[in-house]
Amino acid sequence: MAFNLSKIFAHTDRDPLIRELTLDSRNVRPGDLFLAVPGIKVDGRAHIADALKRGAAAVAYEVEGATVLPITDVPLIPVKGLAAQLSDVAGRFYGDPSRSLNLVGVTGTNGKTSVTQLVAQALDALGQRCGIVGTLGTGFYGALQSGRHTTPDPIAVQAALTDLRKAGARAVAMEVSSHGLDQGRATALAFDVAVLTNLSRDHLDYHGTMEAYAAAKAKLFAWPNLNCRVINLDDDFGRELAGLKQESRLITYSQLDSSAYLYCRDAKFDDDGVRATLVTPQGEHFLRSSLLGRFNLSNVLAAVGALLGLDYALDEILKVLPKLEGPVGRMQRLGGADKPLVVVDYAHTPDALEKVLEALRPHAKGRLLCLFGCGGDRDRGKRPLMAEVVERLADGVWVTDDNPRSEAPTNIFDDIRPGFVTADKVRFIEGRGQAIAELIASATVDDVVVLAGKGHEDYQEIDGKRQPFSDLEEAATALAAWGPEND
C-alpha cells in the first residue's frame, strides 16, 4: 500500500510517495511517514533525526512544544494536536476499513475478551467471518497474533482492520479499553454496535478517579452514527448510561431487572455450564451455554445483544450459543475427575475475583483455594480490596507475584496484607511457580484451586523484562506430579 503524502496531509509543498506510517523511529524504513508525537514516557520528536537517517520520506510532528528540528530536504509537517488526529490520519491512509465492516466495540472493566470472542465465534457460525482485536491479540478465532495492548495504537488499529478485511473479515469484534478511548486510539473508527459489560475499580493509576474512568468508557456510547448500544442493567454505571438519551437503538440485558430487553431468569448452573430462560418482548426462549458462572451468563447476554444489534434473529443466535467456547485463560479448567479441579482465570480486580470465586463455590465438594497477586506499578489502592475479597470467599489463600514490573514483590505484599483480617493464616510466597506447585500439591481431590490474575499470559514482567511463564503450564506440571498420597 502506498499513497502520496497529499492524500494524508493536503497542505504540503512536496508530495512524496508514502509506503507506510509509523510512530516508532526504530521501525522506520525508506518511504515511511514518521509521526512524531509526545508520549507519556517518550517524546517522538526527539527521534526525528533517527527517522530521517532510516529513510523517512516525510515527518509530521506535534508543533506545540517543538524545539529545534533537523535541517533536511524531507518534508517536515507541523501539526497542532497531532496525537488526537492519528486515528483519522491512519484512516485516510488505509482507506477507512471500518466503514466496510460490521464493527462491534466492547468496553467494560471485566468481560471484554469473553464477549468479543463469543461474538466472533457466533458470527463465524452464522456465516459472517469475524475478526478480533483485543487482549489476546488480533486475527481470527483460534489464530490470534498477540499484541501488547488491549486497544492497539491508532495506526496499528487501522492497519489491523485493513488486514482483517483483506483476509475475508466482514465483521470485527474489538475490545475498546478506557486508555484507548481516553487517548483517542479509535476516534476515526465507525462502530456499529457498542457493548458495556460492567464498571468496577481498575486503572485508577491512570485515570485518577472512578468518575474519570467512567467518563472514558461513556465516550463509546455517544459515538457518531452508532447504530446500537448494548448495556448491562445489573451494573450501576450501566443503568446510568442506559438512562441517557441517544439516537441509537438501545438493547439492555439483565439477570435481575425484568424490564430489560434481554432478561434471564431461572438460571441453573452445573459442571456443564448453564441453562436458563431468556425473556424478551417477543416471548420466552431456552438459553444454553457451556460457560461456567453467573458472570459468564452476563457475558453471553452481552454477546446476544450485540448480535441482535447486527440484525440477526434471536432464534438463530440461540442455536449457536451452546457451541461457543470461553477464551484461553478465562475460567479455563484443568484436572478434575481423580485430581483437584484447577481453574485458571485472568481476574485481576476485586470485582472479577469476587465473581470467579462465587461462581466456583458450588463446584467445590471440599475447599475452595485461591492464589492471587497484584501487578506492580499499577493501582495500589485495589491491593487490600483484593485481599478482603479472597479471604471472605475462599477457604485457603496463597499470595504470590503477579507481574511485579519494577516493584519489589515484598512491597506489593505489604500493600496487600492490611486487607486481611487474619493475615497470619495466609501463605505469602515469592516465586509464582513455586507457589502454584505448593498450592496444588496441598489440594485434595475434592478441592477447587483458583489461579487468578494472569490467565492467558505466557510471560511474567520482572524489572522491565518479560520472562516466559504460564499459569496453565505450571498448573499442568503440578497436576502431573499430584498423586493419591496428596489426598
Swiss-Prot record:
Ranges that cross the membrane: none
Entry protein name: UDP-N-acetylmuramoyl-L-alanyl-D-glutamate--2,6-diaminopimelate ligase
InterPro entries (UniProt xref): Mur-like_cat_sf, Mur_ligase_C, Mur_ligase_C_dom_sf, Mur_ligase_cen, Mur_ligase_N, MurE/MurF_N, UDP-N-AcMur-Glu-dNH2Pim_ligase
GO MF, one annotated term: UDP-N-acetylmuramoylalanyl-D-glutamate-2,6-diaminopimelate ligase activity
Matching HAMAP family: MurE
Reactions this protein catalyses: UDP-N-acetyl-alpha-D-muramoyl-L-alanyl-D-glutamate + meso-2,6-diaminopimelate + ATP = UDP-N-acetyl-alpha-D-muramoyl-L-alanyl-gamma-D-glutamyl-meso-2,6-diaminopimelate + ADP + phosphate + H(+)
Enzymatic class: ligase
Span(s) of short sequence motif Meso-diaminopimelate recognition motif: 402-405
Gene3D superfamilies: Mur ligase, C-terminal domain, Mur-like, catalytic domain, MurE/MurF, N-terminal domain
Keyword presence, Ligase: yes
GO BP field: cell division; cell wall organization; peptidoglycan biosynthetic process; regulation of cell shape
Binding site for meso-2,6-diaminopimelate: 378, 402-405, 453, 457
Function: Catalyzes the addition of meso-diaminopimelic acid to the nucleotide precursor UDP-N-acetylmuramoyl-L-alanyl-D-glutamate (UMAG) in the biosynthesis of bacterial cell-wall peptidoglycan.
